[in-house]
Regions:
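Short internal beta-strands
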Residues: 28-37
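Mid-chain, well-packed structural core segment of small domains
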Residues: 60-98
Length: 124
């Protein structure tokens, strides 16, 4: 299973905690992330992550392209509902739209990520 990770700045630590808690499950899958999020996950968990560009340099577009080419099976995108960064929000919304268009499950918070994690376990 190919899993992509993205997170608003204020949610990166939560993403790291999630990946730390489930690293034994995640280690059985191919993992992709934008640069900063991916480095944080890799540095804190030891998980091998394919690092894409940072979101401001096109990392979201790289993930969106992989979604469009059916190369991503699950997206974990932890969002900050209180963000005021319109550009950042537009990038996140575009990724959500790609997931909807190509029927790829997406988790935007911890509760929905738990459902995705359960799916990972079943698909190993």
């Amino acid at each position: 299973m190919n899993i992509a990770f993205l997170a608003h700045d204020k949610k990166k630590e939560l993403m790291v905690q999630f990946c730390t808690a489930y690293k034994n499950i995640l280690a059985k899958h191919d993992l992709y992330a934008t640069a900063t999020t991916g480095r944080l996950i890799a540095d804190n968990t030891g998980l091998p992550i394919t690092l894409l560009l940072s979101h401001k340099q096109g990392g979201h577009q790289q993930i969106n392209a992989r979604i469009a080419y059916n190369e991503i099976d699950l997206v974990l995108l932890f969002t900050d509902p209180n963000t005021t960064d319109v550009w950042d929000d537009s990038q996140m919304i575009e990724t959500i739209r790609h997931c909807d268009k190509h029927n790829v499950p997406i988790a935007t918070n911890l509760a929905s990520a738990e459902i995705g994690r359960a799916s990972c376990r079943e698909r190993v």
